[in-house]
Each structure stands twice: as structure tokens, then as C-alpha cells.
């Protein structure tokens, strides 16, 4: 899930974003 992905439903988006945060940090 990416922050600019507006079409996903919010609960799963938030869940996926929180899960991927460390990976996004490592990959920036």
C-alpha cells in the first residue's frame, strides 16, 4: 500500500501501510 493509493479501503490500507512502514523506510 502506497500513501498515494486513494482507491483502497481505509482499514486495510492503514493496516498494510503500518506493516510496510519499515520496508518503505529502508527502500527510500
Swiss-Prot record:
The keyword Protein transport applies. One of its GO terms (molecular function) is GTP binding. Keywords: GTP-binding, Nucleotide-binding, Nucleus, Protein transport, Transport. GO terms for cellular component: nucleus. One of its GO terms (biological process) is protein transport. The keyword Cell division does not apply. It is found in: Nucleus. GTP-binding protein involved in nucleocytoplasmic transport. Required for the import of protein into the nucleus and also for RNA export. Involved in chromatin condensation and control of cell cycle. Belongs to the small GTPase superfamily. Ran family. Found in a nuclear export complex with RanGTP, exportin and pre-miRNA. This is GTP-binding nuclear protein Ran. The lineage of its organism: Eukaryota, Viridiplantae, Streptophyta, Embryophyta, Tracheophyta.
Amino acid at each position: 500500500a502506497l500513501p498515494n493509493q486513494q482507491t483502497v479501503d481505509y482499514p486495510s490500507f492503514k493496516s498494510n501501510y503500518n506493516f510496510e512502514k519499515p520496508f518503505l523506510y529502508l527502500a527510500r
